[in-house]
Protein backbone atom coordinates (compact mmCIF):
# COMPACT_ATOMS: atom_id res chain seq x y z
CA UNK A 1 0.00 0.00 0.00
CA UNK A 2 2.80 2.44 0.82
CA UNK A 3 4.60 1.56 -2.40
CA UNK A 4 1.52 2.58 -4.35
CA UNK A 5 1.25 5.84 -2.41
CA UNK A 6 4.95 6.52 -3.00
CA UNK A 7 4.52 5.81 -6.70
CA UNK A 8 1.50 8.14 -6.92
CA UNK A 9 3.44 10.87 -5.13
CA UNK A 10 6.35 10.46 -7.53
CA UNK A 11 4.02 10.58 -10.55
CA UNK A 12 2.39 13.73 -9.19
CA UNK A 13 5.80 15.37 -8.76
CA UNK A 14 6.89 14.36 -12.25
CA UNK A 15 3.66 15.71 -13.80
CA UNK A 16 4.23 19.02 -12.03
CA UNK A 17 7.83 19.19 -13.22
CA UNK A 18 6.74 18.37 -16.78
CA UNK A 19 4.14 21.13 -16.63
CA UNK A 20 6.82 23.58 -15.49
CA UNK A 21 9.02 22.64 -18.44
CA UNK A 22 6.14 23.04 -20.89
CA UNK A 23 5.48 26.59 -19.71
CA UNK A 24 8.86 27.77 -21.04
CA UNK A 25 9.21 26.92 -24.76
CA UNK A 26 12.38 27.79 -26.63
CA UNK A 27 12.14 31.30 -28.14
CA UNK A 28 11.46 31.54 -31.84
CA UNK A 29 10.70 34.30 -34.24
CA UNK A 30 12.23 36.99 -36.33
CA UNK A 31 14.08 39.98 -35.09
CA UNK A 32 17.49 41.50 -35.03
CA UNK A 33 20.44 39.57 -33.67
CA UNK A 34 20.33 41.46 -30.38
CA UNK A 35 16.59 40.80 -29.97
CA UNK A 36 17.09 37.07 -30.57
CA UNK A 37 20.07 37.04 -28.19
CA UNK A 38 18.05 38.78 -25.46
CA UNK A 39 15.14 36.36 -25.92
CA UNK A 40 17.53 33.40 -25.58
CA UNK A 41 19.18 34.99 -22.53
CA UNK A 42 15.82 35.52 -20.80
CA UNK A 43 14.73 31.99 -21.76
CA UNK A 44 17.93 30.56 -20.27
CA UNK A 45 17.34 32.48 -17.02
CA UNK A 46 13.80 31.11 -16.77
CA UNK A 47 15.11 27.63 -17.60
CA UNK A 48 17.60 27.79 -14.72
CA UNK A 49 14.83 28.89 -12.36
CA UNK A 50 12.63 26.03 -13.53
CA UNK A 51 15.46 23.53 -13.04
CA UNK A 52 16.05 24.80 -9.50
CA UNK A 53 12.33 24.66 -8.74
CA UNK A 54 12.02 21.17 -10.23
CA UNK A 55 14.95 20.00 -8.13
CA UNK A 56 13.38 21.36 -4.95
CA UNK A 57 10.03 19.74 -5.87
CA UNK A 58 11.67 16.39 -6.51
CA UNK A 59 13.83 16.39 -3.38
CA UNK A 60 11.24 17.82 -0.98
CA UNK A 61 10.02 15.02 1.28
CA UNK A 62 6.35 14.16 1.33
CA UNK A 63 4.59 15.01 4.59
CA UNK A 64 3.70 12.07 6.79
CA UNK A 65 0.32 10.55 6.05
CA UNK A 66 -1.06 11.34 9.50
CA UNK A 67 0.07 14.95 9.80
CA UNK A 68 -2.09 17.54 11.59
CA UNK A 69 -2.83 19.12 8.21
CA UNK A 70 -4.28 15.86 6.86
CA UNK A 71 -6.41 15.45 9.95
CA UNK A 72 -7.68 19.03 9.61
CA UNK A 73 -8.52 18.44 5.94
CA UNK A 74 -10.40 15.26 6.79
CA UNK A 75 -12.31 17.13 9.48
CA UNK A 76 -13.21 19.93 7.04
CA UNK A 77 -14.33 17.43 4.42
CA UNK A 78 -16.81 16.03 6.92
CA UNK A 79 -18.49 19.40 7.42
CA UNK A 80 -21.69 20.06 5.51
CA UNK A 81 -23.91 23.06 5.05
CA UNK A 82 -27.32 22.53 6.57
CA UNK A 83 -30.49 23.87 5.01
CA UNK A 84 -31.43 27.17 6.58
CA UNK A 85 -35.06 27.88 7.49
CA UNK A 86 -37.00 30.31 5.34
CA UNK A 87 -36.88 33.90 6.57
CA UNK A 88 -40.03 35.27 8.20
CA UNK A 89 -42.41 36.96 5.77
CA UNK A 90 -43.77 39.71 8.04
CA UNK A 91 -41.15 41.63 9.98
CA UNK A 92 -42.00 44.12 12.72
CA UNK A 93 -41.14 47.71 11.94
CA UNK A 94 -37.81 48.84 13.26
CA UNK A 95 -37.69 51.82 15.66
CA UNK A 96 -35.64 53.83 13.16
CA UNK A 97 -38.28 53.57 10.44
CA UNK A 98 -41.10 54.66 12.80
CA UNK A 99 -39.08 57.68 13.98
CA UNK A 100 -38.38 58.78 10.42
CA UNK A 101 -42.07 58.37 9.51
CA UNK A 102 -43.07 60.55 12.47
CA UNK A 103 -40.57 63.25 11.47
CA UNK A 104 -41.91 63.27 7.93
CA UNK A 105 -45.49 63.59 9.21
CA UNK A 106 -44.54 66.52 11.47
CA UNK A 107 -42.86 68.42 8.64
From Swiss-Prot:
Pfam families (UniProt xref): REV
GO cellular component terms given for this protein: host cell cytoplasm; host cell nucleolus
Segments crossing the lipid bilayer: none
GO MF annotations, alphabetized: DNA-binding transcription factor activity; RNA binding
Cellular localization per UniProt: Host nucleus, Host nucleolus; Host cytoplasm
Residue spans of biased composition, Polar residues class: 21-34, 91-107
Chain segments carrying region Disordered: 21-42, 81-107
One BP annotation, GO: mRNA transport
Motif Nuclear localization signal and RNA-binding (RRE) per UniProt: ranges: 35-49
Region (Homomultimerization): 16-24
Organism domain of life: Viruses
InterPro entries per the UniProt record, alphabetical: REV_protein
Keywords noted in UniProt: AIDS, Host cytoplasm, Host nucleus, mRNA transport, RNA-binding, Transport
Motif mapping: Nuclear export signal and binding to XPO1: 71-82
Domain-level remarks: The RNA-binding motif binds to the RRE, a stem-and-loop structure present in incompletely spliced viral pre-mRNAs. This region also contains the NLS which mediates nuclear localization. These overlapping functions prevent Rev bound to RRE from undesirable return to the nucleus. When Rev binds the RRE, the NLS becomes masked while the NES remains accessible.
Annotated function: Escorts unspliced or incompletely spliced viral pre-mRNAs (late transcripts) out of the nucleus of infected cells. These pre-mRNAs carry a recognition sequence called Rev responsive element (RRE) located in the env gene, that is not present in fully spliced viral mRNAs (early transcripts). This function is essential since most viral proteins are translated from unspliced or partially spliced pre-mRNAs which cannot exit the nucleus by the pathway used by fully processed cellular mRNAs.
Subunit structure, as described in the record: Homomultimer; when bound to the RRE. Multimeric assembly is essential for activity.
Protein name as catalogued: Protein Rev
